[in-house]
Amino acid sequence: MPRKPPSSPKSSPLQLGRAVAWPDSPEQAKLDRVPNPQKGTNYVARFTAPEFTALCPVTGQPDFAHLVIDYVPGSWLLESKSLKLYLASFRNHGAFHEDCTVAIGKRIVAAIKPKWLRIGGYWFPRGGIPIDVFWQTGAAPRGVWIPDQDVPSYRGRG
């Protein structure tokens, strides 16, 4: 059976396919979702953001992280352009590493209601100490292959 042609970008509520201004803050950013055509199948989808940036809420200095987001979709998939815009909205947002990482995970869960989600925030050193932050919604569905996030611990020259 032929598929229905996609709606034109102008009539779609999604940000995908349209010129969209960068959101000024995470609160203003919109996360879009699209129907999961494989909703009866448990599988893992992964987003990797190796150049995530936020601001230290005390000094205003930039903080950098490598984020890895894994989730088992339910009825919805997270649309990647909206995720890119959401993550970019943190560039001028002040928050501690732990708050950024957990808030991103919770916001995605609220938007798409996955069966399971985990996020790893691998933050580059500030003051000589790297901070790695991990959060997940609970146990992964049984029988789902969950690959390692495969981000090595930060290591200096030693």
From Swiss-Prot:
Q: What is the E.C. number?
A: 1.7.1.13
Which domain of life does this protein belong to?
Answer: Bacteria
Listed GO cellular component terms? cytoplasm
Enumerate the residues binding substrate. Answer: 78-80, 97-98
Q: What pathway annotation does it carry?
A: tRNA modification; tRNA-queuosine biosynthesis
Keywords, comma-separated and alphabetical:
Cytoplasm, NADP, Oxidoreductase, Queuosine biosynthesis
Q: Reaction catalysed? A: 7-aminomethyl-7-carbaguanine + 2 NADP(+) = 7-cyano-7-deazaguanine + 2 NADPH + 3 H(+)
Q: Which GO terms describe its molecular function?
A: preQ1 synthase activity
**Location(s), subcellular:** Cytoplasm
Q: Kindly list the biological process annotations in GO that this record carries.
A: queuosine biosynthetic process; tRNA modification
The active-site annotation reads: 56 (thioimide intermediate), 63 (proton donor)
Q: Which family does it belong to?
A: Belongs to the GTP cyclohydrolase I family. QueF type 1 subfamily.
**Which HAMAP family did the record assign?**
QueF_type1 (MF_00818)
Outline what the protein does.
Answer: Catalyzes the NADPH-dependent reduction of 7-cyano-7-deazaguanine (preQ0) to 7-aminomethyl-7-deazaguanine (preQ1).
Q: What is this protein called?
A: NADPH-dependent 7-cyano-7-deazaguanine reductase
- State the species of origin: Nitrobacter winogradskyi (strain ATCC 25391 / DSM 10237 / CIP 104748 / NCIMB 11846 / Nb-255)
Organism ancestry: Bacteria, Pseudomonadati, Pseudomonadota, Alphaproteobacteria, Hyphomicrobiales
